[in-house]
């Protein structure tokens, strides 16, 4: 008997392909992969090396692995394989595996007088995050971190499979629950499905069906959607349960985060929520909104929300201003998309607590929110972090990135207050946003360069690194008048040309000149220069390395000011690269081997390898069109 190999597709170029390899004598799947767009990626096994997908049975309180039990193997003419597993002398489980037209069907039935002795049946799928971080997207998560079907099994850049279950017995739930268990240290993420115990005369079936996300309703120019639809899912990476749950360096199951075995971070929550806002229902019966809500509630509970209203960013790190802004924007995304005013009413007090913490951080009363970090040269020393997602930069005090995000957060909260008919509260957050906007450009515009500096430190210095990201964000959100915004964008494009940057398939660097050592985390942070001028690590990690997600704001700024041409040129180049799966190289957790950041010539300069945040640039496919911009920026309307 030889190993069984099933490879099925639709028989058309670019169509979905499923690859399954089964054990010759043991009841197991040794290789499992797919490619929904027919680009050949199914050749890479999604399962961990030297492991296999298979069954476990609990009998009399003891677990038995199906691959180790006596098994008869049958293969039909089409290559489908059937395993007849003797669990006890009087109980046999029949597992049938077949694939056709890019689908996979796993069928389970039982025979024998002692089927009732089988207490639990589990199907284990040991995925390899180092290949790509496979995870599950379900609209039904329990408080304990399990989920129910239907679900999308999302293999980034391989594609998505709709996982459903059915039974020949009326009312029978073929899969009781499912879960994700992983290890960051050992680099695994295992999906475990608890199947219904076998019942005589009943056939249960699990089906994996290639799934394609339709273009969002109202999209006029759908030509680019085919290039975006598979990667669109890449931003959603519900975590496996990994690490000691009593230690901040861990994650519970089912929280949106960096990747399936990495950290959730409150400063990034709005990235994932914005994308869910556009496509809340990702498949029939599967909404992303409960997962967004679950992650918001995670950050607004327990030790992660301090009595002061400050929100932890990740692990146990505080002093991140965007850690507070993230859940506020995400809450607007959730309520605006779901209409769940009951949830909003129950949580408005916490949202105000979070927002008011930010308001109190305007320590000098000028309207801008000041970070606790001074931002003065040479002050960011490990283990401390900066005030923002850009945690290896020395950004602090009056930070342009954080204040732009806070501006949107306050506008969003004002809109939420209006939904509840809370006029005075709406007025308060509107006034806070108005005051911030009035101070923003006068404080942060560098008259010598004609664009915004990244931050103004406590000693009064402007820290200006020719930043497309920060300037783009401010222009996109209307903090900069449109005419000046066009001038700034033109200056930055000219600067890009002057410094010789041409690799638009990678995106756009977050800054165009080196960050000196004194404005970088010290003494040994990733990308930290040894030279005082920063030239030795220029283009690496947060010293002007490129990460795709934040390119969104530079693109969106062009669309917002009515100059789509330069943005479309960059976006189309990035989409070509995305189609090849080149914005990630699997989970590496090793600096500088992760391609979540690249140098200007495309070499890896990150550590995650896979960073969900990277894929938010795909929202530019929608923000090219005014109707989508109007929806997202509605809380900013009249203030732009």
Predicted regions span which residues?
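Bacterial N-terminal signal peptides
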Residues: 1-8
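Active-site acid/base region of carbohydrate-active enzymes
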Residues: 223-246, 270-272, 282-299, 304-306, ...
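Polysaccharide-binding surfaces and accessory modules of carbohydrate-active proteins
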Residues: 93, 99-177
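Beta-strand-rich recognition/accessory modules
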Residues: 124-126, 153-222
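Active-site core of glycosidic bond-cleaving carbohydrate-active enzymes
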Residues: 272-277, 290, 349, 356, ...
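Acidic-aromatic substrate-binding/catalytic surfaces of carbohydrate-active enzymes
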Residues: 15-84, 130, 138, 144
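Extended, loop-rich substrate-binding clefts of extracytoplasmic carbohydrate-active enzymes
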Residues: 58-115, 174-191
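Substrate-binding groove/exosite segments of carbohydrate-active enzymes
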Residues: 218-345, 352, 466-476, 529-572, ...
